[in-house]
């Protein structure tokens, strides 16, 4: 079963049939992601730290037949423009199997929660279950989330 294979990926969390999330996968794990039928990878991590990135992640992902979208989000300073780029990427690949990752699934879980509330109309408690099961946002992230929810009418 795909979930058994994918469960070895750091902080892997299946969201539903169309979305999987995790921390940074290895090259071999990206092959498992492709084999599980995912067609798009959205990366919210940076490429400047070898502990949390692959040397040629775009090439690796594309060589496996998946689309690759990179939205580098500074963990210490998430930006509204990053969130809006994420919304655009999610909507552009709607109906596909999407794998979203960052270094530890923290950025992803926060952005996905915001996406679910702001763009899909979910209630906040349900939308942020993934995030709350992984981590408790620090002051910077809590403020960012609250600001985005307030700005887009869900605060």
Which role does the model predict for each range below?
Residues 102:
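Short cysteine clusters
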């Amino acid at each position: 079963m795909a979930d058994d294979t994918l469960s070895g990926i750091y902080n892997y969390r299946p969201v539903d049939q169309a979305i999987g999330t995790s921390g940074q996968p290895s090259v071999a794990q990206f092959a498992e992601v492709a084999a599980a039928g995912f067609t798009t990878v959205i990366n919210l991590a940076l490429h400047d730290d070898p502990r949390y990135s692959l040397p040629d992640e775009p090439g690796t992902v594309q060589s496996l037949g998946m689309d690759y979208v990179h939205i580098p989000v500074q963990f210490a300073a998430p930006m509204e423009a990053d969130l809006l780029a994420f919304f655009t990427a999610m909507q552009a690949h709607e109906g596909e199997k999407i794998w979203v990752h960052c270094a530890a699934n923290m950025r992803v879980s926060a952005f996905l929660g915001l996406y679910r509330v702001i763009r899909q109309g979910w209630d906040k408690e349900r939308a942020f279950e993934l995030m709350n099961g992984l981590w408790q946002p620090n002051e910077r992230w809590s403020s960012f989330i609250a600001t985005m929810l307030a700005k887009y009418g869900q605060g």
